[in-house]
Amino acid sequence: MKIINIGILAHVDAGKTTLTESLLYASGAISEPGSVEKGTTRTDTMFLERQRGITIQAAVTSFQWHRCKVNIVDTPGHMDFLAEVYRSLAVLDGAILVISAKDGVQAQTRILFHALRKMNIPTVIFINKIDQAGVDLQSVVQSVRDKLSADIIIKQTVSLSPEIVLEENTDIEAWDAVIENNDELLEKYIAGEPISREKLAREEQQRVQDASLFPVYHGSAKNGLGIQPLMDAVTGLFQPIGEQGGAALCGSVFKVEYTDCGQRRVYLRLYSGTLRLRDTVALAGREKLKITEMRIPSKGEIVRTDTAYQGEIVILPSDSVRLNDVLGDQTRLPRKRWREDPLPMLRTTIAPKTAAQRERLLDALTQLADTDPLLRCEVDSITHEIILSFLGRVQLEVVSALLSEKYKLETVVKEPSVIYMERPLKAASHTIHIEVPPNPFWASIGLSVTPLSLGSGVQYESRVSLGYLNQSFQNAVRDGIRYGLEQGLFGWNVTDCKICFEYGLYYSPVSTPADFRSLAPIVLEQALKESGTQLLEPYLSFILYAPQEYLSRAYHDAPKYCATIETAQVKKDEVVFTGEIPARCIQAYRTDLAFYTNGRSVCLTELKGYQAAVGQPVIQPRRPNSRLDKVRHMFQKVM
């Protein structure tokens, strides 16, 4: 039996969860469709998802149709959760993009379609809610052509009055997008020769598989209209990715979750081979894993199984397997699709309302960070504050709600701030010698600092022989440098540089690793002062769509938000800008655009990386260290 994995993507309230329920019901997987309003759906598993009627994390369910098993990964639909959308898309064989007939193509529809195109995911478009009063299907289809792609094929004729009737579109003109891109078919069409439906269907399937043609279907998920033709299209057009018939096992982890009982589970896409209970499989670059239990989606449920075949999604209990881990033969992974893996851009401090809940809060945040690579949790080594780093404000709102609803924790969250970084301006070095005041430590350390290109990260090299200074002392120096890099001259993490341990001296037996660990950050700070540092801030690349009448204002307003316009094009009644903008300015820029365009602008953004900060430096207060601050001040007086 063929197994395919599909995703359902849509703007908020377009009906993708309802569509999932309708697919399960029409295929016979369930006896009654669930309701978003009643909280009985099978894919919105989190209380917050059911409460708000939006999907936050990807869930998996399944149905069978025409000897094909279809696993549905119900991908998230909120803009702050695109990272999980991209991660889920990487395991898909195809996608259904849902558009509300009432609302048409929305800003988020364009963002999601942009991601599908970027990752070359075969996609079928489903125009939902055609039974609502006042819909204009011609206008919706035209907006699909203008704002998404002209390479669409309308698969049905739709009559809305006196009752809704959906019929297969047999008009040869409906196949224009197929015929125009095939020389043989185009010659026959121009010559007036007949073209067989089989040839058209083969060309359609090839184009869909290449993600260069997008069939459009209509219906109403809530009332079951147009669902069977959609299932026929999905099972007929989409083909499983990966090497077919491969014997060697290969699978990739795309999701981690915790059950209400605290059990950790991972979701694995099996690209080749067969996985059996009690197998021992290799984790790429790590230890082996014994399969003691596994589950798969089946007919609307998650069931235990002894065997999982190529193409399947497997759910394993595991405390050690991580996101993106590869089980089995890594060389059999299909050609890697593009996938965004942005860094968190914002951070804040979070605390429980009562001190007694601190450990519970840390445990909960550790679980949440384990399931979301864009959420990071750490405890400040000096102030002991809990620091959260994240991508967007709505993400923080959801974390707070989850802590309240799922973990029963009430928290106090400070206003988020942008995460800046620092980079040395030039090569510099500094040495502090043993027994030379004001050095109170039994250690001599010399460090050099060299700036690297943006995005390089931190490199470290020890040029002091292990034969002279043993490993415990060397490790202490590196630990001290790591601590020193946490606070540069402006108080932010230092990056994009190479640190070399050039010189070390110790006195036996009085010198200890602690002396080297304490002195290293002070030497590093002095080297950075000689170098100077450049403040860096996160930048986003953007694509802006706005009505043509706002071309001048959109262009001339960009510098107000430190945005740079790189290209400008006029397409029909729309202007398209590309450029870059500091992350701290994007929310205000979007708000202003939405205001003067009456909500008709769309701004797609992706993290570009860190660049030189614009404007006055943002200085972060230095975190106190009672052990080292007195020594630092002594050195500042003599330097």
UniProtKB/Swiss-Prot annotation:
Q: Which residues bind GTP?
A: 10-17, 74-78, 128-131
Keyword line: Antibiotic resistance, GTP-binding, Nucleotide-binding, Protein biosynthesis
Does the record carry Nucleotide-binding as a key word? yes
Give the signal sequence positions. Answer: none
CDD domains in UniProt = Tet_C, Tet_II, Tet_III, Tet_like_IV, TetM_like
- Is this entry keyworded Protein biosynthesis? yes
An example GO biological process term is:
ribosome disassembly
Q: Name one GO molecular function term.
A: GTP binding
* PROSITE patterns reported in the protein's UniProt record: G_TR_1, G_TR_2
Describe the location of the tr-type G domain by residue ranges: 1-243
Q: Which family does it belong to?
A: Belongs to the TRAFAC class translation factor GTPase superfamily. Classic translation factor GTPase family. TetM/TetO subfamily.
The task this protein performs is described as: Abolishes the inhibitory effect of tetracyclin on protein synthesis by a non-covalent modification of the ribosomes.
Protein known as: Tetracycline resistance protein TetW
Gene label: tetW
